[in-house]
Amino acid sequence: MSTKTVPEPEPHVLAVDDSIVDRTVISRLLRSSKYRVTTVDSGKRALEVLSLDRNVHMIITDYCMPEMTGFDLLKRVKESAELKEIPVVLMSSENSPTRIRRCLEEGAEDFLIKPVRPSDVSRLCNRVIMK
C-alpha cells in the first residue's frame, strides 16, 4: 500500500504596479522562487482580485499609482476583517524615510526600494510567507 504525498500548493502573491515593466520584473522574480503570481495594474483591480480569491499569501504593491496609491491599498486591506491578515509589502523608487515609516506604522510588513533584487524577494518570502 503506497501513500502519495500531495505537494504543497505554491504560495500565491498578488503583485500590484501600474508599470508593466515593474510588474514583469517582480512577477519573474517571484515565479523563479516558485511562487504563483497574479499581477494587476491598480489598487482597485487588486481589491477586485482579493474579493474573488481569498487564497492570497502576500500582496506586494507599488506606492505611487494613479487613483489608489499603494498606501491607500494597504489601509483598505488592514481595515478589512477578511483581508487584514494578508501581509502587504510596499515598494517605491523613492527612498523617503517619512513615507517608509508611515507605511510600516500602518501595518506594512516591509518597504522595498526599486529596483527589486532577487535577494529582496528571497528575504521577503522567507520572512513573510514562510513564518
UniProtKB/Swiss-Prot annotation:
Family assignment from sequence similarity: Belongs to the ARR family. Type-A subfamily.
Induction cue: By cytokinin in roots and leaves.
Protein name per the record: Two-component response regulator ORR3
Mutant lacking the gene: phenotype: Dwarf, narrow leaf, low tillering, abnormal hull, viviparous and low fertility phenotype.
Record gene name: RR3
4-aspartylphosphate: modified positions: 62
Lineage: Eukaryota, Viridiplantae, Streptophyta, Embryophyta, Tracheophyta
UniProt PTM: Two-component system major event consists of a His-to-Asp phosphorelay between a sensor histidine kinase (HK) and a response regulator (RR). In plants, the His-to-Asp phosphorelay involves an additional intermediate named Histidine-containing phosphotransfer protein (HPt). This multistep phosphorelay consists of a His-Asp-His-Asp sequential transfer of a phosphate group between first a His and an Asp of the HK protein, followed by the transfer to a conserved His of the HPt protein and finally the transfer to an Asp in the receiver domain of the RR protein.
Pfam families with a match to the protein in the record: Response_reg
